[in-house]
Amino acid sequence: MHLNTTLLVSLALGAASVLASPAPPAITAPPTAEEIAKRATTCTFSGSNGASSASKSKTSCSTIVLSNVAVPSGTTLDLTKLNDGTHVIFSGETTFGYKEWSGPLISVSGSDLTITGASGHSINGDGSRWWDGEGGNGGKTKPKFFAAHSLTNSVISGLKIVNSPVQVFSVAGSDYLTLKDITIDNSDGDDNGGHNTDAFDIGTSTYVTISGATVYNQDDCVAVNSGENIYFSGGYCSGGHGLSIGSVGGRSDNTVKNVTFVDSTIINSDNGVRIKTNIDTTGSVSDVTYKDITLTSIAKYGIVVQQNYGDTSSTPTTGVPITDFVLDNVHGSVVSSGTNILISCGSGSCSDWTWTDVSVSGGKTSSKCTNVPSGASC
């Protein structure tokens, strides 16, 4: 038998095509009807057993309702490793037992999650039980509040958090995370020893958006310690330390890049706009913009840049350069005992700054500014 040339070529090409094709993906068994039904379930957890029950059953629920959950002392409300697409709803008042420990009180991780609060809810840390004026620097060991770690393509919105013992949100190892319309009210701590009650601490994360936050606290409203593509808008920050980059340096990740603060108000706070890099460390801060920022009754510094954070009496060091720093329409008031602007840069380590329509008044003019780059004034 003789095959014609066309047929031989066709067979050869077909064989080659089969050999060159990648192996098909492994086929896994589809979920059973029972598994699908479980994942479609709305699960409600409440009372003193609610936290442990939620932790045990969390992967069996597509919607988790936490209704008046009383988390036992020394226990984390563990919502880590949730199924993709899980919706968590805080309802009623969530409370926490007292114990000296480091926390966190709540921990969440997963992908495509939605974390919301029902109308009238509150997450009450009752921080006065720990407050002693020391914060994380000593005294009682205080639990951090909310670990938003290893979150991807997720949204946390509409939560009302009251009286955290110390830091509120720790955002770490997260990408494409949105925090929207969050209220943090630690105002009781103003006269009762609240300290280091940072609202949003961000590290080693990318594409984090915080919008519409209302914060009353006693430390940074936002502190970006490392990360890229961070956006904060429409914020109201009262009583704390302002909108901060850093402190940067001395960590495993010391790069801050492409951070924008826009359309926000800072009132009755120690600082307004703040960049702080730790003395004798390395890293970089670049592409940071503050636009349309209003300052009111700032107590210490309206705008402050320090490359000697940790030892401000020493000469600023150059290991963490600050480049492409933009201020656009930053204006407002400092109290008479405060300082309008302080810039403490190392030699040549602050460059490519662009300040436009910057007006901060009411306080003193600093005589301690060093190595102020062109494009800025002190």
Swiss-Prot record:
Its EC number is 3.2.1.15. PbH1 repeats lie at residues 174-204, 205-226, 227-247, 256-277, 285-307. GO terms for biological process: cell wall organization; pectin catabolic process. Pfam families: Glyco_hydro_28 (PF00295). It catalyses: (1,4-alpha-D-galacturonosyl)n+m + H2O = (1,4-alpha-D-galacturonosyl)n + (1,4-alpha-D-galacturonosyl)m. Keywords: Cell wall biogenesis/degradation, Cleavage on pair of basic residues, Disulfide bond, Glycoprotein, Glycosidase, Hydrolase, Repeat, Secreted, Signal, Zymogen. The active site is at residues 219, 241. Residues 1-20 form the signal peptide. Its main location: secreted. It is found in: Secreted. GO terms for cellular component: extracellular region. Disulfide bonds join 43-61, 221-237, 345-350, 369-378. InterPro entries: Glyco_hydro_28, Glycosyl_hydrlase_28, PbH1, Pectin_lyas_fold, Pectin_lyase_fold/virulence. Glycans are attached at residues 44, 46, 48, 52-53, 55, 57, 62-63, 73, 258. GO terms for molecular function: polygalacturonase activity. Residues 21-39 form a propeptide. Gene3D superfamilies: Single-stranded right-handed beta-helix, Pectin lyase-like. Involved in maceration and soft-rotting of plant tissue. Hydrolyzes the 1,4-alpha glycosidic bonds of de-esterified pectate in the smooth region of the plant cell wall. Belongs to the glycosyl hydrolase 28 family. This is Endopolygalacturonase I. The gene is pgaI.
